């Protein structure tokens, strides 16, 4: 018991601020970011000091930030590209707060457009009366644009679509009922027996945003062009990076924190895509997992 208390006290004394003062961390940040390293470090410190993240395990904050940096995506929740989100994850018999990297749906669109192969890409809500029919075999949707009785107060489904420059196009549609089943199946918080946990889930507070990301991720992971950046995003989305291995914390029995996204931005150059931080996964040396069946985005949907 005494050893456990001592270990907890030692962990509290280690912060992001103390870690980045070490020469090894400074050197790696400088190698990764060059002249932008000081700005990145300053932004990361601001993120680490947010009320929702200040008690999170510091290495998990750093590794999550580096994932966002390698993808050249800002982590301001108001922009909707990527997020650093705190979670209570069970380690042994204890719950420890760690930071988790999460993609936003705009981040997926951004990575897709960077390939230069997409002519059009979008994901939207579908309102009552908008659709005539859905072809289950091809995925094609026929919209009824002339229907004067379209009810834009009622969302009945979600659709994601892209068309490549070579002419290939694909559509994926999920009804609201299908999305509800999906959310309850893969989100521990949304399916929790505790009412306050359910209400705190973004599936409750921003169902449409969460659903848009889900259908877009399903489209891109199954039919899109999987660039190295896209593979990394899909693999690391909703994961805590432990020694280079993504750990999907929503697969554990845990209750997510109510307030779970920061509002700070980190801007990183697109060419800064390689790092030797042990917490970051090298996607070229690992098999890319099909993560669309992992629990969906528990940070803000936008």
Which ranges hold each PLM region?
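Binding-interface segments
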Residues: 16-226
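Glycine- and charge-rich intrinsically disordered segments
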Residues: 1-27, 230-302
């Amino acid at each position: 018991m005494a050893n456990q208390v001592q270990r907890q006290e030692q962990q509290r004394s280690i912060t992001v601020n103390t870690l980045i003062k070490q020469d090894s961390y400074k050197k790696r940040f400088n190698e990764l970011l060059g002249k932008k390293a000081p700005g990145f470090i300053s932004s990361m410190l601001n993120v680490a000091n947010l009320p929702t993240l200040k008690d999170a395990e510091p290495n998990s904050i750093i590794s999550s930030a580096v994932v966002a940096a390698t993808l050249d995506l800002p982590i301001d929740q108001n922009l909707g590209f990527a997020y650093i989100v705190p979670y209570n994850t069970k380690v042994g018999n204890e719950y420890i707060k760690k930071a988790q990297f999460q993609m936003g749906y705009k981040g997926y669109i951004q990575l897709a457009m960077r390939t230069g192969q997409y002519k059009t890409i979008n994901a939207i809500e579908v309102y009552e009366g908008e659709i005539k029919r859905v072809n289950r075999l091809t995925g094609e949707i026929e919209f009824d644009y002339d229907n004067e009785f379209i009810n834009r107060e009622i969302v009945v489904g979600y659709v994601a679509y892209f068309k490549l420059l070579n002419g290939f196009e694909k559509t994926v549609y999920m009804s609201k009922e299908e999305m509800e089943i999906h959310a309850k199946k893969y989100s521990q918080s949304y399916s929790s027996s505790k009412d306050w946990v359910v209400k705190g889930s973004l599936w409750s507070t921003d169902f449409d945003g969460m659903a848009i990301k889900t259908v877009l991720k399903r489209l891109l992971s199954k039919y899109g062009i999987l660039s190295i950046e896209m593979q990394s995003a899909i693999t690391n989305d909703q994961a805590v990076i432990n020694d280079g291995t993504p750990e999907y914390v929503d697969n554990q029995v845990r209750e997510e924190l109510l307030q779970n996204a920061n509002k700070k931005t980190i801007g990183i150059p697109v060419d800064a895509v390689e790092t030797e931080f042990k917490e970051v996964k090298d996607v070229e040396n690992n098999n890319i997992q099909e993560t669309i069946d992992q629990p969906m985005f528990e940070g803000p949907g936008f």
